[in-house]
Amino acid sequence: MNLFNRNFQIMDISVVIPLYNEDESLPELTAWIERVMAANHFTYEIIMVDDGSSDNSWALIETLSTQNKHIRAIKFRRNYGKSAALHCGFQNAQGDVVITMDADMQDSPDEIPALYQMIMSEDYDMISGWKKKRFDPKSKTIPTKLFNATARKFSGIHL
C-alpha cells in the first residue's frame, strides 16, 4: 500500500473515495468537491483509495495529489474490493466527519453541506443517503437491492 500526503491535522471533513478503474471521472469529481468545500469554507481532505486499478487511475491520482494539497492517495497492489478500500480510507481519515463517495459521480458533492450539517446539528453518529432515482445498469442496482434487503433484515432499519 502506498500513501501520499500524510500530514496529520484535524479538519471538518474527510471525503473517502474508493475507486477501481475510474480515471475518466476523477478530474471532474475532485474539481466538483473542491468547489463545494471552498463555497462552504470547510477544512477537508479527499482520500482516494485505488483498489488495484488496471487503467490510468493511479497515475492520474498521483498528478492530482501533487496539484492539490487536500488530496491524499492510497494504492492497493491488487483489487481487494470496495469494503477493504473504505476500511483503509476510514483508518486514515482525519476529519471530524467522514463522507464516502463513489468515484463514478453517481453521488453528488453538492449534498456534502447538508450531510455535514445534519451530523453536526442533530448529534448523529452516522447518517446514510440514497438516490431517489438511479441511472445505474442492472448489474449495479440488483446487488444494491440485495444489500439493502439484508441490511433491513438484520438492522431493522428500512434502507
Model-derived features with residue positions:
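Short beta-strand/loop segment that forms part of the nucleotide-sugar
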Residues: T30, E34, F42-S53, I74-K75
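Acidic helix N-cap motif at the loop->helix transition within catalytic regions
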Residues: E24-E28, D55-L64
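Donor nucleotide-sugar binding loop of glycosyltransferases
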Residues: E22-S25, S53, K82, S108
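Acceptor/aglycone-binding surface of glycosyltransferases and processive sugar-polymer synthases
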Residues: R72-R78, K82-N92, V97, P109-L159
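Short, well-formed alpha-helical segments that are part of the catalytic scaffolds
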Residues: E22-M37
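Cell-envelope/extracellular polymer assembly enzymes that use nucleotide-activated donors
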Residues: D12-S14, E45
